[in-house]
Amino acid sequence: MNPYQYYSPQLPQQEPYYSHYEYNPYPQQDVYDPYQMDRQPALERRIAALERQNEQQSRELTRLTNEDRRQNREIARIAEQVNQLSQAVERHTRRLNRLNQRLRTVENRLNIPFTAGEGGF
């Protein structure tokens, strides 16, 4: 009986469950400690080398960023020139169309026949 005067069922003792995944046939070895005192000089050299590499990469990144900005400014300048030339071509095309209309009007008034084989008039 338990302390509360109730009968408790008697269950058979169960073996503890162990998964075969938990089993490690190799005993635990000493954990590698990268901060051991005899490793400090090597770590400091490695840290110094990584810091130098980081500084070099930072300078290279700054250089590439500046080059990218320069190229983008050049692209914007060329795009502006292309836009100006496109507007000029459009103006000249409209002017040429007006001149052609005037020329056709004059040709019609003067009855000048157009013969394409002779290069114009």
Swiss-Prot record:
Disruption phenotype: Non-essential, it can be disrupted.
Top-level taxon: Bacteria
Other observations noted: Present in an increased level in yabG mutant spores.
Protein name per its UniProtKB record: Protein YxeE
Name of the coding gene: yxeE
